[in-house]
């Protein structure tokens, strides 16, 4: 399953209720979010209850509702916080790089490293998020668009420098590259074999660059 089959860039985010992603951070809120990631990954989002999350976080069930409106709000908050952290890390990773191919390589490595270093987060992102209709109604497409924008900018810069084919649409190419990384992350979760997810990044980028390079 590709993320763009369930999270189109031009999706209109129908936020019927405000997310708690922008609530003041704190150790207890962070602990609840971490517990939610682990609980949703281990039990499955639909099978998990807020009480399960509270138990894993070591707090009363009522305490969860001081920070999050519902189980759905927890799921949206996981996505938004993780995407914001990913954006910050990705921007920092390419801030000192001018070379477009190397920027794509660093972005790919960083994306797979984040998921590869936190298997439960990867399960939530690759599996659980995509099964929630309410999440699909509420998630912010802006974060995903900004995240893919880093790849799109590198591709557009490569075209201006004559490194990449001019007939490629940067937005479409960014989706293709991200889609390949997304699929590798899903395969990593489903595989019985244990291996470094980050190590796959270079293979994906090399394959992409071979098709994108100017002839």
Label every PLM stretch briefly:
Residues 113-117, 153, 157, 177-195, ...:
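Amphipathic C-terminal alpha-helical segment
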Residues 77, 91-120, 170, 174-177:
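Hydrophobic alpha-helical connector segments
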